[in-house]
């Protein structure tokens, strides 16, 4: 008697099943070796999700077309066989990837945590413990100046690395990280060097001496408000969170320079709702997810709603600014000049939107962090405050207590103090990624192959004995009097260096110098009783830029 189909124990004949499984695994291996090993695949991650869903349906259709007796359209046997084949395909793909990254990868000789060789998510997982600049510093203390921190990522702490990766003659380019906001573009996110240089020329028109004097008029309005608020709180001589007030000041200022309208945070003494949305939306940058995963998350409304709310607010505000004429030029005026009064195209709107976001985020966070770090060092080094006041005393301030910036820019100790603070507390302390050229680069006798991601964290670089003598000692005089204490000046790059350096550096330094000079001459600064500020500095977080959320100090009016 012949067995019935219901007596058949296998979902498909065993020989056929083994052949199908072997083919599926081989296809997975070939997919990795012939496709995913080459090029970039981060811009449209959902395409790969859709492709594999279609592949699954295609496999199901092929099996169903064979019509083994037990298959029906909704058969669990069909579902199990398709699932097994797809799982085998994925096992082949990831097994090939795993073997390649651990045994055959061009970076296999570079030291680092074993798990970092396998996946970029290793670093993202470690960042739950703290910001990247501290985690990377720990890794360098354990593994040395050159550390593999991901499958294709290398962190290097050496002055030569700063020159080779970021310097004016560097052949490194920007990596996939800068596509996270695509299709919204900004000067910061252009990866193509020619396109970047063309856009930078447009920006440069807004950072000449004449333009900076115009911005100073705008900033002075908000600086006056800031000091009025600080003076009112100094009367009580109780602790205030100076970091919060610098954030209010910075966002109000940069909102005005970007959109010709303030966020009015100094007036309200609280964050604007859109700034809260921005801060929440930037949290994803803290974990340095692979670009494809970041872009996957960014399309999920439940995970990126705050970010998209801010973009909506900024888009509406930017479009209003496009149609306005302003009496005192702002940065955006130079960015609008190429339009010659016409409406922007969709690509130009994305570009203007990206640039507006860049002005706000880069200008606000970095300035507020730098000012907070300077106050921290002022409160820790009262002897340095005396030197700064001795330098400022001969200079005449106006009736509002403001100093001419041209004069401040020439003061050696003031600028040495600012530099020393930025050395130890750089506003961008961790990862500024670059992609090595096809021919690779040599750094500190180590060859980094082409198309790898490299970076040199400024927080660790500022503490490197290869760059500075006694790097842990705060000594402003190393920048003008004892310059032998700086072994290699190229290691100091708080605004980065080279073709992709911060174009807003002159504006930031003007803002910092004028604010710090007035603060020093207006107030005595100290920590509250029993505090030294260290725990608040140690609690600093990072979402590309450093964020110091708390820095309580007591201000006492001097006059």
Curated annotation (Swiss-Prot):
Its main location: membrane. Pathway: Mycotoxin biosynthesis. It catalyses: tryprostatin B + reduced [NADPH--hemoprotein reductase] + O2 = 6-hydroxytryprostatin B + oxidized [NADPH--hemoprotein reductase] + H2O + H(+). Keywords: Heme, Iron, Membrane, Metal-binding, Monooxygenase, Oxidoreductase, Transmembrane, Transmembrane helix, Virulence. InterPro entries: Cyt_P450, Cyt_P450_E_grp-I, Cyt_P450_sf, Cytochrome_P450_monoxygenase. Heme binds at residue 502. GO terms for molecular function: heme binding; iron ion binding; monooxygenase activity; oxidoreductase activity, acting on paired donors, with incorporation or reduction of molecular oxygen. One of its GO terms (biological process) is verruculogen biosynthetic process. Gene3D superfamilies: Cytochrome P450 (1.10.630.10). Its EC number is 1.14.14.118. The chain crosses the membrane at residues 13-35, 48-65, 82-104. Its cofactor is heme. It is found in: Membrane. It is a multi-pass membrane protein. It comes from the Eukaryota. One of its GO terms (cellular component) is membrane. Cytochrome P450 monooxygenase; part of the gene cluster that mediates the biosynthesis of fumitremorgins, indole alkaloids that carry not only intriguing chemical structures, but also interesting biological and pharmacological activities. The biosynthesis of fumitremorgin-type alkaloids begins by condensation of the two amino acids L-tryptophan and L-proline to brevianamide F, catalyzed by the non-ribosomal peptide synthetase ftmA. Brevianamide F is then prenylated by the prenyltransferase ftmPT1/ftmB in the presence of dimethylallyl diphosphate, resulting in the formation of tryprostatin B. Belongs to the cytochrome P450 family. This is Tryprostatin B 6-hydroxylase. It comes from Aspergillus fumigatus (strain ATCC MYA-4609 / CBS 101355 / FGSC A1100 / Af293) (Neosartorya fumigata). The gene is ftmP450-1.
């Amino acid at each position: 008697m012949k067995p019935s189909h219901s007596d058949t124990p296998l979902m498909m004949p065993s020989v056929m099943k083994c052949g199908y499984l072997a083919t599926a695994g081989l296809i997975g291996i070939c997919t990795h070796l012939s496709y995913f090993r080459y090029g970039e695949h981060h811009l449209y991650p959902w395409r790969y999700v859709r492709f594999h869903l279609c592949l699954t349906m295609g496999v199901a259709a092929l099996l169903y077309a064979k019509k083994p007796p037990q298959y029906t359209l909704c058969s669990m046997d069909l579902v199990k066989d398709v699932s097994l084949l797809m799982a085998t395909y994925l096992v082949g793909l990831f097994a090939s990837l795993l073997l390649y990254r651990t045994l055959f990868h061009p970076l296999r000789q570079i030291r680092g945590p074993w798990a970092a060789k396998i996946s970029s998510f290793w670093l993202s997982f470690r960042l739950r413990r703290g910001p990247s600049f501290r985690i990377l510093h720990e890794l360098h203390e354990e593994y040395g100046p050159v550390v593999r921190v991901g499958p294709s990522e290398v962190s290097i702490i050496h002055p030569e690395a700063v020159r080779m990766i970021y310097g004016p003659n560097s052949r490194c380019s920007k990596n996939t990280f800068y596509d996270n906001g695509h299709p919204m573009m900004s000067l910061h996110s252009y990866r193509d060097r020619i396109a970047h240089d063309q856009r930078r020329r447009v920006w440069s028109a807004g950072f000449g001496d004449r333009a900076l004097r115009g911005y100073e008029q705008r900033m002075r309005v908000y600086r006056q408000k800031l000091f009025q608020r600080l003076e009112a709180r100094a009367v009580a001589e109780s602790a205030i969170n100076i970091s919060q007030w610098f954030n209010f000041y910075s966002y109000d200022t940069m909102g005005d320079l970007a959109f010709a309208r303030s966020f009015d945070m100094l007036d309200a003494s609280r964050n604007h709702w859109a700034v809260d949305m921005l801060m929440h939306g930037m949290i994803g940058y803290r974990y340095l997810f692979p670009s494809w995963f970041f872009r996957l998350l960014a399309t999920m409304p439940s995970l990126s709603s705050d970010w998209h709310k801010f973009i909506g607010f900024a888009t509406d505000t930017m479009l209003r600014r496009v149609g306005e004429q302003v009496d005192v030029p702002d940065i955006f005026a130079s960015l609008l000049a190429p339009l010659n009064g016409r409406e922007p195209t969709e690509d130009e709107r994305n570009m203007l939107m990206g640039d507006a976001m860049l002005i706000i985020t880069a200008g606000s966070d970095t300035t507020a962090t730098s000012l907070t770090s300077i106050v921290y060092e002022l409160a820790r080094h009262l002897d340095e405050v005396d030197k700064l006041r001795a330098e400022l005393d001969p200079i005449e301030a106006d009736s509002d207590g403001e100093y001419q910036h041209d004069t401040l820019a020439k003061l050696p100790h003031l600028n040495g103090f600012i530099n020393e603070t930025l050395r130890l507390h750089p506003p961008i302390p961790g990862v500024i990624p670059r992609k090595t050229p096809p021919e690779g680069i040599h750094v500190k006798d180590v060859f980094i192959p082409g198309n790898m991601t490299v970076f040199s964290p400024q927080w660790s670089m500022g503490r490197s004995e290869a760059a500075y003598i006694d790097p842990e000692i705060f000594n402003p005089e190393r920048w003008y009097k004892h310059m032998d204490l700086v072994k290699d000046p190229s290691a100091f790059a708080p605004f980065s260096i080279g073709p992709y350096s911060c174009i807003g550096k002159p504006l930031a330094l003007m803002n910092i110098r004028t604010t710090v000079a007035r603060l020093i001459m207006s107030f005595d600064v100290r920590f509250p009783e029993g505090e030294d500020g260290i725990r608040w500095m140690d609690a600093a977080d990072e979402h590309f830029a450093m964020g110091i959320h708390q820095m309580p100090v007591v201000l006492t009016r001097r006059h």
